[in-house]
Amino acid sequence: TTTAGTGSEVDQWGVVTNPATNEKIGCGGMDSLFPTLAVVDPELMATVPAKFTAYQGFDALFHSTEGFISKANSLMSDMVQLAAIENVGKYLARAVRDGSDMEAREHMAFANTMSGYSMVVGACTSEHAMEHAMSAYHGDLPHGAGLIMISKEYYTHFVNKHCCDDRFIRMAKALG
């Protein structure tokens, strides 16, 4: 993988975009779509521009935060999601500031892989689907940027409903 965000190197999900119809549809879920081999080399990520490092990092973060607050959670999903959240919290800013920081790139690659795997052992919530609709209509909108745009209102809704306060506290601690 050349970026740290989608986690697609370890899951069986993808997105198909049809710009002619403004559709962006998630597809997959079949065992036959699991990758056979994943090469996750942080050195390949060293030249990714800072803003795309940030967008991809937030994509990885939101895969895990969505999964962590979803009802489809387990000990396994909690473990990989919290590992991803912790690594994003500690290393994303460093990777954005200095793309050649290999320690930060390595930890972001790990966070990305764990976030991808979190979709195998858990699930995303509706935030990703909502963003797909946005970037389907606005083809120049990077996916991670769209997620950032809606994240405050999205997560505020769950906080105000007090539906998973303990999970938000655990995520905040993991983020540092």
Where are these regions (language model features)?
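C-terminal and late-domain segments of enzyme folds
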Residues: 51-114, 118
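Glycine-rich phosphate/pyrophosphate-binding beta-alpha loops
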Residues: 5, 113-144
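Short helix-capping/linker segments at secondary-structure and domain boundaries
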Residues: 68-74, 122, 156-166
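A general structural signal for well-ordered alpha-helical segments in protein cores
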Residues: 58, 85, 127, 147-148, ...
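Short amphipathic alpha-helical segments and their helix-coil junctions
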Residues: 39-45, 88-97, 129-135
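A glycine/threonine-rich phosphate-anchoring loop and its flanking beta-alpha core
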Residues: 2-75, 170
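Gly/Pro-rich interdomain helix-loop hinge
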Residues: 137-140, 144-176
